UniProtKB/Swiss-Prot annotation:
GO biological process, one term: bacterial-type flagellum organization
Assembly and interaction partners: Homodimer; the beta-strands of each monomer intercalate to form a hydrophobic core, while the alpha-helices form wings that extend away from the core.
NCBIfam families recorded: csrA (TIGR00202), PRK01712.1 (NF002469)
Protein name: Translational regulator CsrA
GO cellular component: cytosol
GO MF entries: mRNA 5'-UTR binding
Gene designation per UniProt: csrA
UniProt KW keywords: Bacterial flagellum biogenesis, Cytoplasm, Repressor, RNA-binding, Translation regulation
Pfam family, one: CsrA
UniProt function note: A translational regulator that binds mRNA to regulate translation initiation and/or mRNA stability. Usually binds in the 5'-UTR at or near the Shine-Dalgarno sequence preventing ribosome-binding, thus repressing translation. Its main target seems to be the major flagellin gene, while its function is anatagonized by FliW.
Subcellular location: Cytoplasm
């Protein structure tokens, strides 16, 4: 897993057409903005697990530190 550090307003690029921007931080919550083509699904982990029940995910949803 790639781990990145970003500040509010900073963006990361995934490939040529996906961006993730840090919009805000409030305590332990981070607000992201994403931009991706319509054919790319973007979901929070708990929503993804509902859509794909029983799928083996390498994310546990718990902080590994």
């Amino acid at each position: 897993m790639l781990i990145l550090t970003r500040r509010i307003g900073e963006t990361i690029h995934i490939g040529d057409d996906i961006t993730v921007t840090v919009l805000g931080i409030n305590g332990q919550q981070v607000k992201f903005g994403t931009s991706a083509p319509r054919e790319v699904d973007v979901h929070r982990q708990e929503i993804y697990e509902r859509i794909h029940p029983g799928s083996a995910s390498h994310f546990s949803g718990k902080h590994p530190y």
